[in-house]
Every structure is written in structure tokens, then in C-alpha cells.
Amino acid sequence: MRRPFALFFLTFLLAASQDDLPTPLPSPTPDTLTEPDGDPISDLLKNSSQAPSTELPSGVEIYGKTIRLDGSLNQGNQKASDTIVRYIGDIQLNTDTGLKAYADLAVTNFSKKTVQLSGNVSLYQDGLVYRGESSVFNLETKSFETKDLRLGFSPIMLKAKSIRQITSDGRKVFIAEDAGITTHDTEDPAFWLQSKRATIFPDDKIIFKDFNLRIGNRNLLWLPYLAQPFDANRGYLIAPGGQTNLGAFVKNRYGIMLGGESDLETGEKKGAWLLSQWHADLYSNKGLGMGVDFFDTRLESKDGYGWLKIYHIDDLNPEDERAGVDRTNIKPNRFRAEFVHRIPFLETPDSRYSFDANLTLLSDQYYLEDFDPSLFRINRAPDNFLGFTKRSPNSLTQLGTRLRLNDFYQSDTRLPEFTHDWIRQPFLDTPLLYESQTLLGIYQERLAKFQRDSLQSEADALLAGDPRFDQISRLLDDRGFTRFHTYHEFSLPIKAGHFNVVPRFGAGHTNYQAVQGPDDSIGRTHVSANIDVSTKFNKLLPNFKSDKWGIDGARHIIEPYSSLSWLSTNDLDSSFGRIDRLTPTSRPRQRQVGRFTAVDDLQDWSILRLGMRNRLVTRRDSGMHDWLTMDTYFDAFIEDPELDRDFSNLYNDIRWNPVPWLELDLETQFPVSTTDNFTEIASSMRLMPDDDFEFKVGYRHLNNHPVLRDSDRIVLETFTRLNDYWGIGTHHRLELVDSTLELQQYNIHYDFDSFVGSAGFFIRNNRSQDEHGIMFNFGIKEIPSLSLPIKIGAQ
């Protein structure tokens, strides 16, 4: 079995060097000195009985307890250029540029046009702090020499042999030679980031050359180059831990910006737009995995586009299962390549055109489960799409294709598909509103390869005449067709007294051609009519006030509503191979045809919905706040398209958010009749009773659903702050139906003053076998990107 431990130890070299930083400078005197009552030195020099006719430059003032004149003035030489003036005790130097300096002694030399400050020197300007034993102020340039000073600005402090300030693209940049950087603001810091040269971009990043991480008197990590941003997406990240199927592991990520041009003086990439995150992960049970993620930072992050992710691992044990499901024929060569991008290529005053890509190539069906379980839980079968899109204020048009790059899960293809949606808008300058949806495409759906192979093997083993053979044949039949679908709807909002009435009428057609399998081509015509009626009542409650519960007067709003929806269409035969079809859910279906995405499952329906919304609104933060909302409704089926019901459940959707430390969400549905209906309760509550304790509890009950499994699940999360240093977090998930504690997770947090650390441990019961994991978190408080993250939930 291959064990690439050598690569691991080459990455993290531990050095035993005892080279200490220079002895820390003595703490400066308090920075709260008040301006003394004495006259500034310029007033003294204007006194003709004691000084020549010279003055400090305009905008410079020096104060001190004692003034002494030295140099040629005391020898009878009245040359102003030889004058030396000493200030002793509680020195304060001010300039009109905002610079302030404090020291024990100031020596002004008019010959050299300098002021020598010494003894507990502190310089302040633009939020920056310099500290040291001496510094020289130039009277002509009104600037200080910062050699052998310590520089401090949030969140770092810098000690260096020399520091110089330059301006790059309008920003102040500091270049320090033989530098030591820390965020631990004490006389004897617990750690230093050392380098031969450090370039500091305040509020952005630090670039190190010949970097050492030093804790105490030990060099812990050396790198020839490190660009360490204050942004958590960049810089170095390390995550050690362990998990049953992965073994012990250390995940390493290093993020840097690419693109742009390098500045020769600062080493910064100007105009860099491509964020790259490089991964090198070592697993004792899997081997070495390496990859890179690229993010286009020019795109809006909210769009969810703009990255390329590549990862590969030569798996030492690819058939080790995680959830107790046997694996066979899984090759060691495991990888993932994901490209998600939107490339705008044309923009007009009314429209924007772009090329969109969303592609994911996986080596096998278990890759996401092993190496990206957080994505696996929400999207275990990623789509693959390429297309051109046109967006305008009133419409969305797309010509694209859905590909089948991964044959190990069931998916459909669209080669190609054209869609055009008109949003609801006025029709020809009339009160009528119009909306429509049109799509045309060639569609196919295929089973996963392992499913086809399994069914084919089962069919080959059957005896002649076995009824199971026909069932398998139907499952193995190719499913596909060419489909044209269009639907158009008009609506007319009407105000009738106290009532809001919105009638809607729509019609459409769906045509299937080139149908694969036993079915013939077919056309379907859809006719739909709807009417929505609602009204509102409200009552002002000015005396309903409570500081404890966040109420400053209230208004109670009641909104009764009803909706009648009718659809008539040609039904498809039950054997027809539907592609855009319904999936099981416990929530009510969408009953507006234009928003009904399961086009192939459109069926006749007649449904009346009756409901009432209640809102209790109060004043908060110069605005209005929904203190309590409740929506209660049910459906009466004149014709039920799915389950032949007379009535749906009675639904209640409740949200209560009275104060920031309390939130309650509750969704319930109970049978109105006793015929084939189910019960569901889904609730969650977050409560922070005091500053040191917070918990969140959720409960879900599902019973007698026709498709979904019964469930009684409790989820509990807590965080307790024991004191200024210790905190404990927990997460438990319990399934009461089979009395299974599905997840136990425990996190311990400790504040090390300059560092923060956490350790987490979890046990997951997969019913067939247990899974264990552990991870650690260690980071510098003020530099979140230089840390070890804890991501128990993602594992």
C-alpha cells in the first residue's frame, strides 16, 4: 500500500532554530499626554534676548517641560544655523499634516534642520503608530526617519531594521527590511511572522520574502514566499483531522491572486482578477490529493458563476464504503472537474447577452460522497448545461443543451432546447396583463449504467414467460421525444369595493414527435381559468407595547383570500415515458400552469383554495417589522389530479420573530378528512436566553405519507460560553422512529489571547455502520485567513 508520507513531511518542516527576535522594546509611556501650558519653541526663539532671528517651519510646534539652548549661541556666536535647542521631559511635537510625536527628549539642530527624538518615542499619523527609542524629524520635509521603529496599525504590529513608506495607486504601502510582524499586542508577543522583507498593504495583505512562523523561540514553518491577505479566501489554510473512510488527513490550501502586472517595487500584482486556491491534501487511507480552484472576481458573487475547480487523487482504497453500501469496480483514478461561468459578450440598452456554462465531470458515483459530502447532500447528480442567454427587463430567452457527462446516475439530455419566457406585463397599453412560456427541444432520459447492467443481468437470468421480464423491458426501453410546448395567459386586476379580484385565462399546446418506445406522437391542448379574490382588514393597537418583547405599538392585518383554479387537458397514457415529471413532496403543488415546470405531468384539475393571512406589525429601527405572521389555508378538490382526495390537509405556516434573540418557525398540516391524508409538523426555534448560551432546536414529524418515509426527527444545536476563554458547542440529530442517534458532534473552543483554537469530534450512525471524525481549528485572531478551519458538518 502506497504511503506518501515523505511529501507530507517536506511540506511541514519543523525547525529547532533558537534565533530570537531582538529584545522587545520597553513599553512606551501612556499615549494620553496633554498639551503643556508652556510656550512652543518658536515663541522662545522669537525672544531677541536669547535667540537669533529664526523660527520653526510653519505648521511645526514642539512642547516640553524644560528648554535649554546649546551650541554656538552659548559661545558668543550668533549664527542661527549653529543653534541647538533641547527640550527635556514630556515632549510633544505637532505638525499641520496631522502627525503627532511623543518622547522624553527632543534636540533641534537648525544647522542640519532636524529634530532628534529619543526615549520612549511614539509617532501617530493616519491611524498608524510607530514606537521605538529614537527617531529623527526633518524640518524641511516634515517627515520622520522610521529606522529601528515598530509600526502598528489594525490588526498588526511591525518591528523592523528599517521601514519606508511609498505610495502605490493612491494607497500607502510600507516596505520593511528584516521584519517581525505580530498581532499579539503585549510586551512579549507569543508569536512572530518573520521575513527578510515584508511589504504591507494596510487592510489588504502582506507579502513576505523568506518567511518564518515563530512561536516562542521555535521556528515552526518556513516558506520562501508568502502573500498573506486579510481576506479569508486567500493566503494559507491548513485543516488537520481524521475520518473513518479517509483516515487521518491534513488538508492544505493556498490562495493567491493571478493576472495583472507585477509592481517591481512592491511585488504586488496590479489589476489581478483571478483568485486561485491550490490544494494539497494528504489522507492516510486515500493517498495524496491535489487540485486547484480558479474564481473570476470580476463577476458578482451573488450570481453564483465564475469558477473552475479541478481535483485528482490516486485513491489507495477506492472501494472502502462510507455508508455501508458495497462498492465494486471503482478505479483508483478519482477526480472532479467543475466549470461554472457566465461570459457576457454583448450589451444593448434593452438587453444583455451571455454564454453560460455549468459542467461537472466526476470519476464515479461515490466521489462527492467521499470528498465533497456537503455538495453530495444537496446535489448528488449535478446537471451539465451549456447555453446562450438573452436577458431583458421583460423577457428571458435561452438556447442551450444539457449534456450527459456522467453515466453513473440517471439523467436526461436536451440536445438542444430553446426557451422563451415573457414576464407578466401590460398588454398593448391596456389594463390587461400578459405572460407566456414557450419551449422546444429534443429530450432523452437514460438510466444509470450500473442500473441498466443490473436490470439486464436480472432479465438474462429469468425463465421464459416470467412477468417480471416485461417490467424490466419497459424500464430498459429508451425514453425520449421531440417536444414543443407553449402557454399564454392574460389577467386583469380589478378593485371591486374592498375586494381585490384577479381573473386569469390561459391556453396552450404541447406536441410530442419522434417518441421513442411503444408510444405514438401526440398533441395536447391546455385550457386554464383562475380567479383570485382577497381583501384586507386592519386594526391599530397603539397601546400594545413591551420593551422586553420588542413591541412599540402594533397593527393587526387580516387578509382573507381564495383562489379557484381549473385546467382541462388531454391526458397522457400511463405508459408514456415522461421526462419533466413530478417528484414526491409533502408541500402543496403549484397550481398556476405557467409556473408548473413538470410539463409532462399536466393533468385535469379543479381546485378551490381558501385561506387567511394574519400579520402583527410593529415599529422598529425607523421601519416596520413583522412581529408575528401566520398563513392558514386548505384546498378543496373538485377534481384531484394526483390522489383522488376531497380535501387537502389544513396548512399553517407561522413565523414569530419578536426580538433578535428569539426566532420561531412552524409549519404544520393536519388532515381535514380521514381519507388517505397524512400529518406533518416542521418546526425550529433559536433562543439566546443570555449572552453566554444559545441553542437551536428543530422537530419534524411525518406520518402516513403515500410516498415519503415516516419520520420523527429532533435536531439540537447548542453553544455555551463558559468564560472569557472556554466555549463548548454541540450538535445532535435523533430519529425517534427507529431510536437512532444519527449524529453526535462536539466542539471545544479556547481563546489563547493571540490565538483561537478549536477541536471537534463527531459520530455519525449510518445504521449499517458508524462513522467517526475529528478536526482541529487553530488561527491568529486578527488574520482569519491564516488559520486551521473546523468543518465538521462538511465531513
Could you say what each language-model-derived stretch is?
Residues 184, 209, 216-218, 223, ...:
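Short helix/loop capping segments that flank catalytic or ligand/cofactor-binding pockets
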Residues 136, 143-145, 158, 169, ...:
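Outer-membrane beta-barrel translocator/pore domains, especially the C-terminal barrels
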Residues 334-363, 382-403, 408-416, 420, ...:
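Recognizes the extracellular SEMA beta-propeller fold with strongest preference
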Residues 4-13:
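Bacterial N-terminal signal peptides
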